[in-house]
């Protein structure tokens, strides 16, 4: 009998998976890296976000790439560790809470990023082929429009639909929920896109 088929231990193990996921997700790599590089508080420039796109507005491409990678790995690590310890359902819980940890980190007064990199990392751990599809959609849209936010929003619209068609259903449910939350976190970006005032990739300020 696996740990999560035992009704006496499953709630505690799922709670532990959630805690591990949240703590991993809440590490603010964008803020840490920019401070270590002597660039100050990334929350005081551009969109005020702690993610890779805003780090790119410092002009340091390597730092932005490192932020993207480390933020994504938070989601991947949460999914893979929980899956190895407690199985599939626990991995989805850990991935979800890693995403929430990035969006609402306790260390920063629950004001974090918008979750795109962690979303990618969760996909890498839970549905690797869908992560590749996400990357292709993002890259194609970004190449055409130069809008990071639009690229992510489009990918987060398409990937859940693909998962509902191809399965598995529980992963589709998780990714749909992540997409809805991230779309909500991007509401100001959506307003700026509609107004034609959204910053393009590489644009400072």
From Swiss-Prot:
Family under the similarity heading: Belongs to the PlsY family.
Major place of residence: membrane
Role, per record: Catalyzes the transfer of an acyl group from acyl-phosphate (acyl-PO(4)) to glycerol-3-phosphate (G3P) to form lysophosphatidic acid (LPA). This enzyme utilizes acyl-phosphate as fatty acyl donor, but not acyl-CoA or acyl-ACP.
InterPro entries on file: G3P_acylTferase_PlsY (IPR003811)
Subcellular location: Cell inner membrane
TM annotation in the entry: 13-33, 68-88, 90-110, 120-140, 147-167
Membrane topology recorded in Swiss-Prot or TrEMBL: Multi-pass membrane protein
One Pfam family hit: G3P_acyltransf
EC code: 2.3.1.275
Pathway(s) the chain acts in: Lipid metabolism; phospholipid metabolism
GO cellular component: plasma membrane
Gene Ontology terms: biological process: phospholipid biosynthetic process
Protein name, per record: Glycerol-3-phosphate acyltransferase
Disulphide connectivity of cysteines: none
Keywords linked to the UniProt accession: Cell inner membrane, Cell membrane, Lipid biosynthesis, Lipid metabolism, Membrane, Phospholipid biosynthesis, Phospholipid metabolism, Transferase, Transmembrane, Transmembrane helix
Listed SMART domains: G3P_acyltransf (SM01207)
Keyword match Transport: no
Enzyme's top EC category: transferase
Quaternary state and interactors: Probably interacts with PlsX.
